Amino acid sequence: MSAKREFSHITLASTPFKKRIDQNSLKTDSDIEKDTNIAHKCAERFNYNTNLHRKVTLSDRFELAALGYEMKAKPRTIIEKHNDCDEFHFIYRKEKKNDYGTGSPLSAGLSLSNPLPAGRGFLSPAIQNTSNQFTFSGSPRITPQKHTPVSANHKPARSIFDDIPSNIA
């Protein structure tokens, strides 16, 4: 998770999906109670870490999802707070919106048209723009990923050494 994102505390929501999981797996009341205790501990750990502005681990969220609890991005209503029913709502705090104004530059690899961060399995726009310039010169058994026709007019790729003056002593 990015350090710039801020999450508020979460609340758990027992859903029909959770009830169906419990019924299909023939869980006893004590097993269901154990699951709720584990879910409460995960949520408390999540909330504790976010309040201290620590990085929140994915394991808590995965564990909650494995137990069948759903995390929602809306706060509890006043009516739900007064009812205090057995259903608990462990919800994920909404992320702060980043201001992409003229004053704040986008973080590396991000753009308004492409909000995905550069990372594994993702080509940044800079790499995508230059990938058409490279021609394939490998063995004939390997097929090229991108092949540009020979008749296409394109400029040779600039080297990082082009800007260095030749009379360096």
Curated annotation (Swiss-Prot):
Coiled coil: none annotated. Changing R61C: In xf14; abolishes the interaction with pid-3. May abolish the interaction with erh-2. Disulfide bonds: none annotated. It is found in: Cytoplasm; Nucleus; Cytoplasm, Perinuclear region. Expressed predominantly in the germline (at protein level). One of its GO terms (biological process) is 21U-RNA metabolic process. Disruption phenotype: RNAi-mediated knockdown results in defective activity of the PIWI-interacting RNA (piRNA) silencing pathway. RNAi-mediated knockdown disrupts the localization of tofu-6 to the perinuclear region of the germline. RNAi-mediated knockdown does not cause chromosome segregation and cell division defects in early embryos. The keyword Cell membrane does not apply. Transmembrane segments: none annotated. The record marks R61 as: May be required for interaction with erh-2. Keywords: Cytoplasm, Nucleus, RNA-mediated gene silencing. Its main location: cytoplasm. Signal peptide: none annotated. Residues 137-151 have a biased composition (Polar residues). Residues 137-169 are annotated as: Disordered. It comes from the Eukaryota. GO terms for cellular component: cytoplasm; nucleus; perinuclear region of cytoplasm; RNA cap binding complex. Component of the pid-1 variant of the PETISCO complex (also called the pid-3, erh-2, tofu-6, and ife-3 small RNA complex) containing at least pid-1, tofu-6, ife-3, pid-3, and erh-2, which is required for the biogenesis of a class of 21 nucleotide PIWI-interacting RNAs (piRNAs) that possess a uracil residue at the 5'-end (also called 21U-RNAs). Within the complex interacts with pid-3; the interaction is direct. Within the complex interacts with erh-2. Within the complex interacts with tofu-6. Component of the pid-1 variant of the PETISCO complex which is required for the biogenesis of a class of 21 nucleotide PIWI-interacting RNAs (piRNAs) that possess a uracil residue at the 5'-end (also called 21U-RNAs). Within the complex acts as an adapter which binds to the complex via erh-2. Involved in the biogenesis of 21U-RNAs which guide the piwi protein prg-1 to its DNA targets for silencing. Plays a role in small RNA-directed transgenerational epigenetic inheritance. This is Protein pid-1. It comes from Caenorhabditis elegans. The lineage of its organism: Eukaryota, Metazoa, Ecdysozoa, Nematoda, Chromadorea. The gene is pid-1.
